[in-house]
Regions:
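Phosphate-handling catalytic interfaces
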Residues: 3, 7-15, 19, 23-166
Length: 166
């Protein structure tokens, strides 16, 4: 349901949700603000951090669904691009990615942040704007957190406006 809420706020379809679930989510979203949404969607995936060689970063990016402010996504949040790659993978694909890209856990500096989930929405390319914003809203970096919360609140406000127009 967390991915469903974030996809709906992004204006995208969430075909894995039933009609009843979609109806309930619309009700929740009417009363939601960015802080509460961040808190309620934080369990959508488990985050694991890795060190990675520079030469393997591009490969990691091709094997995941990029998120947060990775690469060109940084512009969407008015953040400076960093050399950290962040994105989503299925739990079943994690070991293969770690092996192929020689990722090491517990080694600094952190270069890769993977959000691991069993229920990754189907699709190509980057995650939805709502998911990226939620990832940033959970960041320990104050600029990223603010950018994520502001974007989530804007998406919520836009969603409310569209609901009132219908």
């Amino acid at each position: 349901m967390a991915f469903g809420a974030l996809y709906m706020l992004s204006g995208l379809d969430a075909p894995w949700l039933g009609r009843q679930q979609r109806y309930r989510l619309k009700g929740y979203l009417r009363q939601m603000d960015a802080e509460n949404l961040t808190r309620l969607t934080r369990r959508r995936a488990m985050m694991v951090e890795y060190w990675c060689r520079d030469s393997n970063l591009a490969k990691v990016e091709t094997l995941i669904r990029p998120s947060a402010a990775t690469g060109t996504l940084a512009d969407s949040f008015q953040l400076a691009a960093t050399d950290v790659v962040e994105g989503y993978v299925t739990a079943s694909a994690l070991d293969d990615i770690v092996r192929q890209c020689r990722l090491k856990q517990g080694v600094t500096p952190v270069r890769v942040r993977l959000h691991v989930t069993d229920n990754l929405p189907a699709g190509e390319g980057s995650m939805s704007l709502g998911v990226c914003a939620a990832d940033l809203a959970e960041s320990n970096d104050p600029r990223e957190r603010r950018a994520g919360l502001e974007t989530l609140q804007r998406l919520i406000d836009d969603h409310h406006r569209k609901e009132h127009q219908e």
